[in-house]
């Protein structure tokens, strides 16, 4: 429930309003206004709306925690010091790929839901960010090689794999955009709340440089999944099952 409330409140707080078109420009001044006492009341009204949306009873503890987390989100955005153009919140994306399944080829839909799609300008470059909110503990936002993303083990950077997957889907919809996959760990300290993903200490602000290799590895994974000669086995990393809703 906590994650549901946070995501819904963040969505309504940032999404385009009836007076906007398909985009909404969030200014640093607006973000600063949300950090005032009146802004706190505005935030909590969005949280209460989220409870109603989830058809859940309000919980003062959850309201307090989500308020603090939304304020952290707002501070992270305000720290950019530039306008943020919101292109979408909780945006559904989909594409179709052809996968070899044994002796035949099948069409497989790839579907995702992006927490936030926005556009900012950094050092004169217009960047479209694909942001995935994370309310859990802080993870390393850097990766070493493709095995780090695709080989299932205790050190697998599955959260980076997820946002790369979203970026691949978005690339099909916005082929000309300079896409930057981002992870925003809300719990982390302010100084470590950099949402960008790094490879060999280099910030990824153009997913196109990695897209082809990622697509090839994803294709291999999908063909393993759909290969009828291979057993459909559970993950060997049982620690991943601790929070699985199907564990029981």
Predicted regions and their residues:
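Non-catalytic protein-protein interaction segments used by genome-maintenance enzymes to assemble
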Residues: 88-171
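Secondary-structure transition/capping motifs at alpha-helix termini
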Residues: 16, 20, 77-84, 103, ...
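A residue-level signal for conserved active-site and pocket-lining positions in enzyme catalytic cores
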Residues: 6-7, 70, 116, 166, ...
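Residue-level recognition of the N-termini of beta-strands and the immediately preceding loop/turn
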Residues: 85-87, 128-129, 177-182
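C-terminal, charged and often intrinsically disordered regions of DNA end-processing helicases
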Residues: 1-16, 107, 237-248
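Metal-dependent nuclease catalytic regions and adjoining charged, substrate-binding loops involved
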Residues: 154-160, 167-248
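A non-catalytic, helix-rich entry segment at domain boundaries
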Residues: 8-97, 202-205
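Hydrophobic (often cysteine-bearing) scaffold residues that line and stabilize catalytic clefts
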Residues: 2, 6, 35, 62, ...
């Amino acid at each position: 429930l906590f994650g549901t409330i946070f995501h819904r409140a963040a969505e309504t707080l940032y999404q385009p309003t009836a007076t906007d078109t398909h985009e909404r420009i969030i200014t640093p001044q607006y973000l600063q206004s949300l950090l005032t006492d009146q802004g706190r009341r505005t935030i909590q009204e969005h949280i209460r709306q989220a409870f109603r949306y989830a058809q859940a009873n309000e919980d003062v503890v959850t309201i307090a925690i989500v308020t603090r987390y939304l304020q952290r989100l707002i501070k992270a955005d305000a720290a950019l010091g530039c306008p943020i153009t919101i292109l979408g919140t909780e945006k559904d994306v989909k594409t179709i790929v052809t996968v070899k399944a044994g002796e035949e080829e099948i069409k497989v839909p790839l579907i995702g839901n992006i927490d936030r799609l926005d556009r900012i300008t950094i050092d004169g470059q217009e960047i479209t960010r694909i942001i995935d909110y994370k309310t859990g503990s802080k993870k390393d936002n850097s990766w070493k090689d493709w095995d780090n993303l695709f080989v299932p083990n205790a050190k697998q950077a599955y959260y980076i794999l997820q946002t790369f997957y979203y970026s691949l889907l978005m690339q099909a919809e916005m082929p000309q955009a300079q896409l930057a996959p981002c992870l925003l760990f809300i719990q982390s300290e302010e100084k470590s709340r950099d949402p960008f993903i790094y490879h060999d200490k280099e910030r990824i602000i153009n997913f196109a440089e990695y897209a082809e290799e990622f697509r090839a590895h994803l294709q291999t994974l999908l063909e393993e999944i759909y290969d009828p000669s291979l057993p459909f086995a559970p993950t060997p990393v049982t620690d991943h099952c601790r929070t699985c809703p199907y564990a029981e």
